[in-house]
Amino acid sequence: MKKQLMTSCLFAAVLAAPAFAEDADVLQSRLNQVNSFHASFTQRVTGAEGGAVQEGEGELWIKRPNLFNWHMTTPDESVLVSDGKTLWFYNPFVEQAIANWLKNATGNTPFMLITRNSAADWGQYNVKQQGDSFSLVPKADNGNLKQFTINVTANGTITGFTAVEQDGQRSTYQLKSQKNGPVDDAKFHFTLPKGVTLDDQRQ
C-alpha cells in the first residue's frame, strides 16, 4: 500500500512539473509584451493577523531588463533606482544613500522578479495560473518570501502584486494609471544630492 501511494505521488509530481513550467512561460510571455511603462501605485502592508501595518503610495518607472525607478512618496519618501549597473537606495529623511552592484541584488524579491522577467528567476518557483493571476511559491524554502502573486492581463499590463513573507506579513501593491511606452532614460539616473551621505557598498 505504501509503495502504491509513493508511486502515485511521484506520478502526480511528474504530471505537475510541465504544468508549472507552462504557466511560467505564459507569465513571462505576458510580461514581455510591455518592456517599459510608468504607473502610480498604492501599498498596503498587513501583519500575520490581518491588521494594517502601513499604507502608502508612489510612482514606478520600468524599462526592462535592468532599469527602474521606484519612488515611494508617502508615508515616508524613499527612492530605489537602477541605472543598469548600480542599485541606489535613497532616504531623504535621514539624508543617506546606499549604492550596491545590481548584479549582487537578490533575485527573490517581487520587484526584482517583475523587472528582470528572467526565465532563470521564474525557474526557481512553482508557478500556477488562474486567469490573470499567477501564484508563485519558491521551490527552495530558504528565503524570507513564502508566496508571491502577480496579476497581469493578457496584453501585459500589471494591475497588482502581493508578497507574503514567512512570518505572515503581507504586502499588497495595486498599480493604476499605467502608461505603456518609452520612458525617458533620465528617470534611471541617480545623482547624489548635496549634503547626503553615501554608503558605497560596491567593493
UniProtKB/Swiss-Prot annotation:
Primary location class: periplasm
GO biological process, one term: lipoprotein localization to outer membrane
Record localization: Periplasm
Pfam families: LolA
Signal sequence interval, chain numbering: 1-21
Keywords: Chaperone, Periplasm, Protein transport, Signal, Transport
InterPro entries, alphabetized: LolA/LolB/LppX, OM_lipoprot_carrier_LolA-like, OM_lipoprot_carrier_LolA_Pbac
Record GO cellular component, one term: outer membrane-bounded periplasmic space
PANTHER family listed in its UniProt record: OUTER-MEMBRANE LIPOPROTEIN CARRIER PROTEIN
HAMAP family assigned: LolA (MF_00240)
UniProt record similarity statement: Belongs to the LolA family.
Task of the protein: Participates in the translocation of lipoproteins from the inner membrane to the outer membrane. Only forms a complex with a lipoprotein if the residue after the N-terminal Cys is not an aspartate (The Asp acts as a targeting signal to indicate that the lipoprotein should stay in the inner membrane).
Subunit structure: Monomer.
Protein name, as recorded: Outer-membrane lipoprotein carrier protein
The gene coding this protein: lolA
